[in-house]
Regions:
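Short beta-turn/strand-loop junction motif enriched in small, turn-promoting residues
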Residues: 33, 62-63
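Vicinal oxygen chelate
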Residues: 1-3, 6-15, 35, 45-49, 64-139, ...
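Core segments of cupin and vicinal oxygen chelate
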Residues: 2, 11-54
Length: 139
């Protein structure tokens, strides 16, 4: 039997590598761990997501994103969602209002420069992810 330890990384395609790197660094505070090089040129990189988790980014000029993609979004746990929202707004990035979700978490949503949807997530002491129990979806 396989025992999964954790999600290692999520991979996204970028239209503009440096704009994408700047967004994740300046807006979300995610530093580059290393670059992928080919023929002396950077064509991708790994971003530190905390712990042993990462976001992997590769240049792909023709990439498009839509509601039809198999992966809809990825989620980043934050320590303080109110502070995260304030910081993101200070960078001129559109961010949804904080929502208290049916699973007793707080969430807000943004998009990166490539249109990738990112959920920002703060757990509470009552979060279903920790205490279980079915929840009625309100969306």
């Amino acid at each position: 039997m396989i025992k999964v330890k954790q999600l290692a990384h999520v991979c996204i395609f970028a239209h503009d590598l440096e704009a994408t790197r700047s967004f994740y660094r300046d807006v979300l505070g995610m530093d580059t761990r290393f670059n992928f090089l080919r023929d002396g040129e950077i064509f991708g990189f790994y971003l530190d997501c905390g712990g042993r988790s990462h976001v992997e980014v590769f240049q792909k000029d023709a990439a498009t994103y839509s509601e039809l993609n198999q992966i809809n979004h990825f989620c980043l746990e934050v320590e303080d969602i109110d502070a995260a929202i304030a910081h993101i707004k200070s960078k001129g990035i559109d961010v949804t209002a904080k929502k208290h979700a049916c699973d007793d978490t707080f969430q807000a949503w943004i998009r990166d420069p490539n249109g990738v949807k990112i959920e920002l997530f703060e757990y509470t002491d009552k979060s279903a992810q920790f205490i279980g129990g079915d929840r009625i979806a309100d969306w």
